[in-house]
């Protein structure tokens, strides 16, 4: 009955808001069991939570017409939560504590909760749509809760090797209890209802005391306070002539800001003989000797530079750090990242940090290293996410200490492991009260010191193809849950899913005329692009992207695109300087002007043909990901190509790439299908010790 009611009322809607305004007028009272009556009927299990719902005014809502998901914590969970939060607050008031940690809870007694805290806790556990566990895929629950927050999902196994699902780190103990107006899932812990910003969330965790102190003293906590742009008023608009078929696409539903902090726990600092902020600053002066300003809040201070390198303006969940096992489905669109990659294809992302330097995040799927970590646990490199991973240190042999790799005169750590949050949550001895998700960002714990050094990065980490998906260049696509979109950001469609990017929505994009329609199309299994998604620009397009900063040096800048009869003639600019002659995007790679020849039609596996194409300024697509059109490696796909835009010296300054349609007879139907960029050090291109297949990845 519930599903029939829901479909009957919602079937005509082509899009819905993920946080709906719930009409409480003319409520229909069900004769059967509702979510609210079910909870009340089982008060011996949910009585404390029922009290909170009543105080917040939500119990009557859960007894009335609608469609809801309720994650219901047990009485034990509520009692434990109140005691823990009260203890955290009281401990922060003791002598020697750096500052008060305000949890909103100042008593372990349920009756002492304020109305506002009851409201926050209650709304955290209720979603305005009904979802069974079979509806939940990926890394977030498919709708925001009534607090306008996404809840994270993770999976594991219990002591009997049975599958277990976690919501915001809380284990589902009983699930999929369907009622007339929704579904109830029982959770073993209260879901973190924190409205803390990222710095405040870090401050609440005692095992991050040194990092939190450094974050505060440098003033960098002030750069991570934004959450939502309340001046953004275009959520309900649609842009005409925006998709590949000249159809309309919606504007983004919101403009959220987001951040990620990679944090060393105190135990990591202690292992490196760092016990307080003075010790850390002394070491920072060794790692950043040119940062000589003694003022901690100066960008020219060594401590400031150390902390800034840990911070991103992208809100990255653990399962979105790299494109691995990413799934999504909305309407008629489905996506599984593993359908798009070779099993041993490394997964890498590159982001500019608040230091203005690049951080590499990688899961080395091609590695066969298996070794015990510091606790004796056997770990596989191929299933581990690293920061600043280097192939060089294990190219010819396994490092002597695979989980503590250090190089150079300063012994800079590489292959810094990002700890799996499921493991961190389970280790309550070392990480009590770990809470990964803040209001506006994510906290990741790392197992070693994270240090930036130009020479080390250029020589060990970024000495290869730096491939960056266009969607990763624009933080707002990640922060608003549009990149790798899975139907949870606010719209539901029956076919393709995409969003128009209005001018001024992101500081990382410039649009130079009103006819330009720059849009993002979310991944689907039928797309041939890297990571399954793409950006398009329709009409008389003229737009630019901000490039991430790389270590100073000479690089080959490449751009990947899919050609076609309606793809225009493009003039490229880098930093407002014309680069070469206009490029005809209307031809495919097997056109003689590009010169593609399939590897299996040559006598040397395509080596000579690669050189011929490169002399014309082109490369075949990489072999490390798949194009469904050819049923195999994208290298075989003749509709796509990589273009060498320019070879130039990139300084520490900010650089832009501009893409302009100069097709004089375009009637507005041309569009530019762009996929990723590559920045490749010229020094790496000259190396002869790199295997051919590695260079083709």
Spans of features found by a protein language model:
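Sec-dependent bacterial lipoprotein signal peptides
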Residues: 1-18
């Amino acid at each position: 009955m519930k599903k029939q009611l829901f479909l009957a009322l919602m079937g005509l809607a082509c899009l819905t808001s993920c946080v709906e305004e719930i009409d409480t007028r003319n409520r229909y009272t069900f004769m059967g069991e509702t979510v609210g009556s079910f909870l009340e009927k089982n008060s011996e299990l949910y009585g404390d939570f029922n009290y909170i719902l009543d105080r917040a005014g939500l119990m009557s809502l859960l007894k009335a017409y609608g469609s809801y998901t309720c994650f219901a914590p047990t009485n034990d969970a509520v009692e434990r939560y109140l005691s823990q939060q009260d203890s955290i607050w009281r401990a922060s008031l003791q002598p020697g504590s750096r500052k008060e940690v305000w949890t909103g809870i100042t008593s372990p007694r349920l009756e002492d909760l304020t109305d506002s805290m009851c409201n926050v806790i209650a709304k955290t556990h209720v979603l305005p749509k009904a979802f069974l566990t079979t509806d939940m895929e990926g890394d977030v629950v498919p709708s925001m809760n009534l607090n306008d927050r996404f809840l994270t999902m993770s999976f594991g196994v219990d002591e009997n090797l049975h599958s277990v699902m976690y919501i915001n780190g809380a284990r589902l103990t009983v699930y999929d209890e369907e009622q007339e107006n929704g579904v109830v899932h029982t959770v073993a812990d209260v879901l973190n209802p924190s409205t803390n910003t990222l710095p405040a969330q870090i401050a609440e965790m005692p095992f991050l005391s040194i990092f939190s102190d450094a974050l505060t003293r440098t003033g960098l906590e002030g750069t991570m306070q934004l959450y939502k742009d309340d001046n953004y008023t275009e959520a309900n608009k649609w842009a005409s002539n925006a998709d590949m078929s000249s159809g309309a696409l919606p504007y983004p539903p919101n403009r959220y800001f987001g951040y990620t902090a990679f944090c060393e726990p105190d135990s990591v600092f202690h292992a490196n003989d760092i016990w307080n902020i003075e010790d850390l600053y002394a070491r920072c002066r060794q790692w950043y000797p040119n940062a000589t300003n003694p003022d901690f809040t100066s960008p020219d201070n060594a401590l400031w530079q150390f902390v800034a390198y840990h911070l991103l303006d992208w809100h990255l969940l653990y399962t979105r750090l790299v494109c691995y096992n990413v799934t999504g489905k909305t309407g008629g669109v489905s996506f599984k990242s593993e359908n798009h990659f070779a099993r041993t294809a490394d997964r890498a992302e590159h982001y500019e940090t608040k230091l203005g330097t690049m951080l590499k995040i990688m899961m080395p799927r091609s590695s066969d290293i298996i070794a015990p970590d510091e606790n004796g646990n056997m770990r596989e490199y191929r299933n581990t996410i690293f920061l600043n991973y280097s192939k060089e240190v294990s190219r010819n042999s396994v490092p002597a200490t695979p989980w503590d790799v250090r190089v150079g005169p300063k012994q800079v750590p590489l292959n810094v492991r990002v700890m799996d949050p499921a493991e961190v949550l389970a280790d309550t001895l070392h990480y009590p009260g770990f809470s990964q998700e803040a209001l506006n960002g994510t906290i990741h714990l790392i197992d070693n010191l994270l240090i930036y050094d130009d020479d080390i990065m250029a020589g060990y980490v970024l000495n290869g193809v730096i491939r960056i998906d266009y969607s990763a260049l624009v933080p707002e696509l990640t922060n608003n849950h549009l990149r790798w979109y899975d139907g949870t950001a606010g719209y539901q469609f029956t076919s393709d899913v995409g969003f128009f990017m209005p001018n001024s929505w992101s500081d990382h994009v410039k649009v130079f005329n009103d006819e330009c329609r720059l849009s993002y199309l979310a991944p689907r299994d039928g797309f041939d692009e890297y990571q399954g998604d793409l950006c398009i620009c329709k009409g008389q397009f003229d737009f630019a992207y901000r490039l991430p900063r790389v270590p100073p040096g000479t690089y080959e800048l490449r751009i990947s695109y899919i050609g076609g009869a309606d793809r225009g003639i493009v003039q490229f600019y880098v930093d407002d300087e014309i680069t070469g002659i206009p490029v005809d995007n209307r031809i495919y790679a097997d056109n003689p002007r590009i010169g593609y020849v399939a590897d299996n039609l040559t006598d040397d596996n395509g080596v000579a043909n690669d050189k011929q194409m490169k002399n014309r300024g082109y490369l075949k697509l990489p072999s490390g990901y798949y194009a469904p059109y050819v049923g195999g490696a994208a290298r075989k796909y003749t509709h796509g190509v990589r273009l060498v835009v320019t070879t130039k010296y990139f300084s520490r300054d900010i650089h832009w790439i501009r893409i302009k349609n100069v097709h004089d007879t375009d009637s507005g139907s041309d569009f530019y299908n762009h996929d990723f960029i590559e920045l490749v050090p010229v020094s790496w291109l000259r190396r002869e010790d790199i295997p051919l297949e590695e260079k083709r990845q």
